[in-house]
Amino acid sequence: MPSAPQRPLFSRGSWPEARRLADVLRQETTGGLLLLVFTVIALVWANVAGNSYEEVRQFHLGPAALHLDLSIEHWAADGLLAIFFFVTGLELKKEFVAGDLRSPRAAALPIAAAVGGMAVPALLFVLVNVLHPDSPEGALVGWATPTATDIAFALGILAVVGSHLPSALRTFLLTLAVVDDLLGITVIAIFYTEQVHWTPLLLALLTLAAFTVAVQRRVRSWWLLVPLALATWALVHASGIHATVAGVLLGLVVPVLRSEEHGGPEAGPGLSEHFEHRWRPLSTGFAVPVFALFSAGVAIGGVSGFTAAVQDPVALGVIAGLVLGKPIGIVGTTWLLAKLTRAELDENLRWVDVLGMAMLAGMGFTVSLLIGSLAFGEGTAAGEHVTLGVLVGSLLSAVLAAVVLSRRNRVYRRIEAEERVDADGNGVPDVYER
């Protein structure tokens, strides 16, 4: 009996999934443009306004009795990014429960590519810092810095350069970035936790369980859910584990589908979609840009200061990981998977398209900055050099991706036009009905 034909790599998914992801991508694109603006503001502020930038971001506020007397920079990283990771948890669960990735075969490619896109940058960072004669002591602690992908920044760049990247590649990039974020937060929880305090951690599990029971029963009352979420966040923070882990866990326990008790899947979506509509605009429009404002500002010190900073092995390792490691890891893993499964690319695409998309994944901004600050601390020379390395690496990745993808824009416009044709007028483009 002949085997079923192998589905092409980067082929179109279902129309409902494509429509949902298009809405997500529009919001992420807007967030990416805001991220660009706030990053520029941070750099200008840090370099032209004396010490005011450092004074503001190191200003402490919060209840000291609860061990929450944190700097504004800490509040942005530990608090606001928890919202970002909450939305990430919602998105990831939806993809694997109700999205096109509920099929193990479909999920294998983005997961494998995300792993390859993390392993190779980490390896390059380690190689640079092991082989460089001037590598500072303890530099290897930053190995995970260049392993992340910032989807909002990548889509913001796409909006600026006007690329018409096909929906299948955009979807793959989004899914890869979401998996990347989950792997990144796992790395943070495992490798960047110095000491675990078990009492608050166990209490956090209790409040998380209460939150889980509430959302499974379709409780939507903010006066109950928000205090439970805040208590979980505060207790995880007190446990010594990075507080953003709480955001992911809270997102992952929200149901995607309705239970039979509440009408089953046919009665409508679960609370996940409701929460995502409420919280994604806050994440992309406020939380992540404000985090960038208080994390991306680094005093460059003119041409000589910039040159010295990027020659630091720590910065060089980050740049090499983002610019070279990401595309090598993603394209290499994808090519290897294609060979092992004997799958072919979609007939409209070429490997250069995968390369351009992989270069976009080299924009590691948000999670890379977070890991860099955890690895090297605030206000240290290595920490500032890592920040500059992330900025330079992301910028170079954006430029290279723009060059590669812009050369294929004519093909992308043709694919985009085909995806809009609805000859029978039923509201579903014809390419999704074949």
UniProtKB/Swiss-Prot annotation:
Gene Ontology BP, a term: regulation of pH
Protein's UniProt keywords contain Ion transport: yes
Location, primary (coarse class): membrane
Protein's membrane topology: Multi-pass membrane protein
GO CC annotations on file: plasma membrane
Cell compartments where the protein resides: Cell membrane
Catalytic function, reaction form: Na(+)(in) + 2 H(+)(out) = Na(+)(out) + 2 H(+)(in)
Presence of the UniProt keyword Cell inner membrane in the record: no
GO MF annotation list: sodium:proton antiporter activity
Transmembrane segments: 30-50, 70-90, 108-128, 141-161, 172-192, 195-215, 286-306, 318-338, 354-374, 386-406
Entry keywords, A to Z: Antiport, Cell membrane, Ion transport, Membrane, Sodium, Sodium transport, Transmembrane, Transmembrane helix, Transport
Pfam families: Na_H_antiport_1
Family classification: Belongs to the NhaA Na(+)/H(+) (TC 2.A.33) antiporter family.
Function: Na(+)/H(+) antiporter that extrudes sodium in exchange for external protons.
PANTHER family in the record: NA(+)_H(+) ANTIPORTER NHAA (PTHR30341:SF0), SODIUM ION/PROTON ANTIPORTER NHAA-RELATED (PTHR30341)
Entries under NCBIfam families matching the protein: NhaA
Name of the molecule in the record: Na(+)/H(+) antiporter NhaA 1
Gene behind this protein: nhaA1
